[in-house]
Amino acid sequence: MKEVTANFSAKDIEREVQEYWRTHDTYKAVKEQHSAGRAFFFVDGPPYTTGQIHLGTAWNKIIKDSILRYHRMNGRNVIDRAGYDMHGLPIEVKVEQKLGFASKKDIETFGIEKFINECREFAIKNKELMDAQFENLGIWMDFKNAYQTIKPWYVEAAWWTLAKAQEKGMLERGYRVVNWCPRCETAIADAEVEYWDETDPSVFVKFPIRGKVSESLVIWTTTPWTLPANVAVAVGKEFVYARVHAEKNGREEYLWVAEDLVKSVLKKGRYQKFETLETKKGAELIGWEYDSPLMDVVPIQKEIAHRVVAADFVAMENTGMVHIAPGHGWDDYVLGTKEKLAIVCPVDGAGKFRPETGIFAGKFVRDANGEVLDALGERLLATEKITHRYGHCWRCKTPIIFRATSQWFLKASEMRDLMLSEVKKVTWYPEWAGSARFYDWIKEARDWCVSRQRYWGIPIPVWICDKCDKYRVIGTIAELEKASGQKVPDPHRPFVDQVTIPCECGGTMKRVGDIFDVWFDSAVASWATVGFPAKTDEFEKLWPADFITEGQDQTRGWFYSQLGASTIAFGKAPYKSVCMHGFALDAEGRKMSKSLGNVVAPEEVIAKVGVDVLRLYVLSSSAPWDDLKFNWDGIATVNRTMNILWNVYRFPMPYMILDRFEPEAKSGHWDGSFVRSHIRELPDEDRWIVSRINTVAGIVDASTKECQLHRATREILNFILEDLSRWYVQLVRPRMWLEGESEQKIFAYETIYYVMRRLVDLMAPFAPHITEEIYSNLRCKNDPGSVHMLDWQACDDALTNRELEHAMELVRSFDDAVQNARQAGKRKLRWPVDEVVIVTAKPEVKDAVARLNEVCMDRANARKVTVVIGRWDRIGWHAEPVMKALGKGFGKNSFAVKGLIEAADGNAIKAAVDAGQKFQLKIEEGKISKPDDLKIGTDYEQDVVEIGIEHVRFTEKLPTDIFSAPMEDGTVYVDVALTPDLEAEGYAREIIRRIQEMRRQLDLAVEDFIMVDVAVADKRICELVGASWKPGIADEVRAKTLSLHHSAEPAGSSHQLAKDWDVEGIAMTIGISKVA
């Protein structure tokens, strides 16, 4: 062991520790140490390689790292391969921004191969950057062999999975409505749609009923641009609709609107007169035909047979009739399929109208809203603005549209029951993440559109014949090379697009142009990361994953995509347990964003307080599944606790080194045997701290197993602050100063060493740097080379003592109460008091104080501490009248009775009412009215008034110099009266404190001796202290010589340090010098 610097520098420690890990390849050594252990197969949810990690990503990896370190220390062979999502729109959009591209046309002009190379280079460069960022956070994962979705073997895992789906009849080519980003010109998943408010038109439109004059159905929509694709109007079967005769500006017409909405709709249309002529149920309207109000300007509308249909999603709002465009809405599409309506989608991939829309051709749909309204003319009943939640592309933030296109789908809806069954077999942290949130999401599962119309991704391995339209799904690169007779150097676009396969019909099979949904990439991670399907050994041994953890948004993302792909491919869930964590937000609960200026980067925190503080903060500030509301005050609190830990670790070092202390370690290997074998001999405070660290270990162990990392880390931080620093160190400090050979000192050394060794073991998964640093100084000759190579030590039940822990808790409550009572009595803790009394009704308080009486006396700085069960005879009671009760009982005499109570003996009144009796007050003549004025029974013949417990309340009446404060299950009374003896000790302690402060200013070592000169201006105080405390002062401050004399003169400049002090109003001058 070596002495430790007083200045705690997290950054220096972390830099040195990480260099130590690199030099000694500690991560590899730890992995090899547990290679024969039971496997713990972890699958890393892959972040996109788009640049700098943010606070949420850091939190995610810290959670993972803490859990993996815990399992390694428990002897598990942890499979901890890192992973990266390196395909998809996240990468493409970043590269497009870099190249200044605005559309797919720009990419095509630039060249697909060049664009793919740019994406690959961008993804790899950022992967390397993120590797370094994660390693700087102290993350121990296999980054050298990280799975990368761009690797050929990974691509094969996705291809194999799709081929398996085809084999099981779970792959379908279909023309359906999907979420569509018009900027990226691709389908996007439901989980990729982000919602925020947009302001759109809110329009009411008249659809003329075929064969009727001036008679129309009134519909409402917020997407006028979809009207060129209208094919039907939906009504509610059971709704009642009204035929309304309406007049405006002398023109009459007939409008059909839901009866309950007639007034609001007609008012919006500014009709001067209107009346309901008849009503019909929605069921009676089914089959009615109508014409499009745009049929004269949109050619395609002339070809559509428009009619009224029923739908269960129609609501009694707006007009009660819904415009149906099956090519532009999911509900509309489902209804259109059911009703065999035309699926019309006259919009191209860029969101522009096709030629069949006539006057709107070539216009971007959302920009055309105004022109559509103009074209409606008199068919536009009313228009307003509405602000509502609208979906946007997750990557480029463009408002999405719904668009019917030809896509490839996995039949997830047919696997719904199996997925729900499998979810129940998974252990979820928290439980409701699976049983409620995820379960509910799966219940609504639709078929999964796995195709995307982009470039940088895993190409969909489907080849279609240009002659017979037959298609073939390829499962591996080898299969493709065999079928095509061509080498496939890179399974990405555009190379794989050039590979053709001869068809049996004589035609040529060419690959479809689509790539996989990037969620499909990560969906196969749990089998791809073990080399499946090319290798099967590890898959058969390890799969499914033991554990995964990601953010709550992954219930719709990675948790779901994995489950969908796995149930289709293997018929079971790909993971055994899942921890869902929250989002990293700012202190006000807002999402961090550059526009709000509230982004806090991990590097910013690390630069200020270091990695371990960041780790402990994000782990302790909230439960993993709750959102993390970052605030700097919380960071500061954890940072203070780390400084306190450093000071506690540093505290015994000078004494241990001076005494050449070596912990008992058999064969140079420490195992805590000294404490276990001497536990009954140790002082109570040592036995207590040993019990506490083991109790904490049990809580930390149980909490970490259940992913309750907040509970585990809070328990550790609280132990450091409350148990170790504020309590145990204060109790044990005097024993560190004992001279020579001392059993009590050895007990203290062995105990604090034991506690620190156990503490760094417990903290290692959460704060790997500071624990490594402390361990490196504490470890014995043959101990493992790293704290992370230690075996995890849970609670040692043989060393726990719940009774002692409870007793000490009572004593700590006593300690707080003593300080409060002293403060009330203006008596500092440094000044002794003669007696402290505890009054309680609980025998266990008396037992605790009796057992720990020396601790109580030491902490209270009292000559004696006693416990009284029931009542202390020095405490009196003052009876205070309860006027409300007196008024009710004595009426106008209540003030007279009040005076009698105040003048009476409070102790006597309390004794009577406590015994359940009435107390009689003697009436003074003239004070009380005639008996018939009294409302309660009194005996006037004896001249008394009876009062009960309801008439009075009691406050303590303390003797002079006695002050009280409440404690758990009792009250503490402190006698602050000073005797000459107590006064002498008080001044002596004040002098000692100041000399010790001057020793620190001279930076003296613990063992250094000094010469001291104390001049006291007050003769009485000088004589009082000198008579009994001069040797005691010299001993405490390690003074070879001590001069204590009465003088108002300075001590002189012959000393190394001389200072004037005001000691409780007494002027003193103290000079000290180190003895050579």
Curated annotation (Swiss-Prot):
EC number: 6.1.1.5
Annotated family: Belongs to the class-I aminoacyl-tRNA synthetase family. IleS type 2 subfamily.
Pfam families for this protein: Anticodon_1, DUF5915, tRNA-synt_1
Catalytic activity entry: tRNA(Ile) + L-isoleucine + ATP = L-isoleucyl-tRNA(Ile) + AMP + diphosphate
PROSITE patterns associated with the record: AA_TRNA_LIGASE_I (PS00178)
Superkingdom, natural source: Archaea
Species: Methanoregula boonei (strain DSM 21154 / JCM 14090 / 6A8)
Domain notes from UniProt: IleRS has two distinct active sites: one for aminoacylation and one for editing. The misactivated valine is translocated from the active site to the editing site, which sterically excludes the correctly activated isoleucine. The single editing site contains two valyl binding pockets, one specific for each substrate (Val-AMP or Val-tRNA(Ile)).
Record's GO cellular component terms: cytoplasm
Protein role: Catalyzes the attachment of isoleucine to tRNA(Ile). As IleRS can inadvertently accommodate and process structurally similar amino acids such as valine, to avoid such errors it has two additional distinct tRNA(Ile)-dependent editing activities. One activity is designated as 'pretransfer' editing and involves the hydrolysis of activated Val-AMP. The other activity is designated 'posttransfer' editing and involves deacylation of mischarged Val-tRNA(Ile).
Protein name: Isoleucine--tRNA ligase
Binding site for ATP: K594
Motif window: 'HIGH' region: 47-57
Underlying gene: ileS
Compartment(s) where it occurs, according to its Swiss-Prot or TrEMBL record: Cytoplasm
Motif window: 'KMSKS' region: 591-595
Record note on quaternary structure: Monomer.
NCBIfam families: ileS
